[in-house]
Amino acid sequence: MDRIILHCDCNCFYASCELLSHPDLRQLPVAVCGDPTERHGIILAKNEPAKRCGVKTAETIWKAKQKCPGLILLPPHHRLYAEYSKKINAVYGEYTDLVEPFGIDESWLDVTNSLHLFGGDARALADTLRGRIKREFGLTISVGVSFNKVFAKLGSDYKKPDATTVIARDNWRDIVFPLPVGDLLFVGRSAQELLGRYGVRTIGELSKCSEEMLETLMGKMGSQLYRYANSLDDSPVRGAADREPIKSVGNSTTFRRDLTRWDEVQSGISLLSDSVAMRLRRYGLYCGGVQVGIKNSRFQVFSRQTTLDHSTHLMREINDTALRLAKDLWKAPDPIRLLSVTALHLTEEAQSYRQLDLLGTDDTQQEKQEAVESAMDALRKKFGRGVISYGVSEDSLSGEKIERD
C-alpha cells in the first residue's frame, strides 16, 4: 500500500508573520530584510504583491527597489517566527505523530495510519489544515499530497499561495516531468548547471538518464537524484519519537597538508564554525557551549571546551569562541593535521535565552547578525552551499572535505 505524505509549506512566512502586526500593509508590496537602511542588504522574504513586482528572495535591496520603487521594508523578528513555527507544528501533531519539520516554515506529515480517523480523504485533510492555519493564525500554507516525501514537497511548491496539489500514481509524470530539474529536492545551482551541460534540464530528462551515468557524474547524489526523478524515494517521515535527541553538532576536516600558521588555523575554524552554525539553524537548535579539537602530525589529539553565557546559533559567536579556544590549545608551530568545532549543550529554539544588556546594544547587534546569517541561509538554499562564504582566506582549505560528526 502506498504511503500518504503531506508537505505543508508556510507561504511567504517571514513577511506573513510581520504583516500580522501591520494589517494595513497587506495589499502593498512588502519585504523583510536585514537592515532597511542599507542599500546592499539582502531580501529575506517578500509578500505576494512584492512577488508580482518581480522582487526575489536573496537579491539586494537596491535591486528590489529598482523593480518596485514603492517596496516597503520591514526588519526581521526571528523569535516571532520560531513561536509561530512551534504553534503550527502543534496543529499538525493533532493529525499524526509523524511530523518532520524541514526548516522553520515547512513540515512533512505521514498520515498513512491516521487518515481514516479524519474522513479518509487526503485532499480534504490538506484543505482542513489550510483552513485551520488561516483561521487560527492568520497565515496561509500550501500543501502537497503524494506517495513520497520528494513529490509531496514538489506539490506544495506547485501552486501558491494557499493551495493543495495532489501528485498521485496516475498523474505524477504529467506534473513532475515538465518541471525544471532545479525544482527537485537538494538540486542546487551548481548541480543544475552540471546537469545542464549534459542536456538535462527537466526532471523528465533526468529520469531517462541511467543511474550509473548519474553516479559517475555526481557520486552518491547522482544515484539519489535518479531515485527521486523516478518516484522511488522511500525515505521515512521521522516523527519526534523516531528522532534521537541531538546532543551535539560538529564538523571536522583532515587537511592534505599540515597547518603551521595561525591564519590557516583561523580559516579552518571559520569554515567549520560556519558549517556548524548553519546546521544548528536548520535543526532549530541553539548551543550553550563550544568545543575545539586538534590532531597534530603525530596523531595526538587535544580538545578544549567552554560554556557560553547565552545560547546561540550564530556563526560569529561560535567562531569567536572557537578561535579563543584554538589559540589557547594550539602550541604553535606544532603541525595540525585535523581541526574540529562542535556545538554542545543544545536546546530547542523556543527554549533559548540571552542575558539582557541594560543599554540594549547586545540585542540590537544580535538582531543584525541574525539578519546577516538568515540572508546567507536564503542565498544558499536558493543557489547552493558554495554561493557565499565569510571573508576569510581559504587557500589552505582548497579542496578539503568537511566531515559531519
Task: Label the model's feature ranges.
Residues 147-150, 230-231, 286-297, 336-347, ...:
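A glycine-rich phosphate-binding loop feature that marks nucleotide/adenosyl-phosphate handling sites
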Residues 108-113, 303-306, 356-360:
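Short, hydrophobic beta-strand segments
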Residues 1-227, 237-240, 278, 363-405:
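Gly/Gly-Pro- and Ser/Thr-rich, intrinsically disordered tail segments characteristic of DNA damage-repair
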Residues 13, 36-39, 297-300, 346-349:
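Short, charged/polar surface micro-motifs in flexible loops or helix N-caps
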Residues 310-405:
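Acidic, metal-coordinating catalytic segment for phosphate/diphosphate chemistry
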Residues 72-73, 300-304, 351-352:
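Short small-residue beta-strand/loop micro-motif enriched in glycine and branched aliphatics
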Residues 7, 183, 191-336:
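DNA-contacting surface of Y-family translesion DNA polymerases
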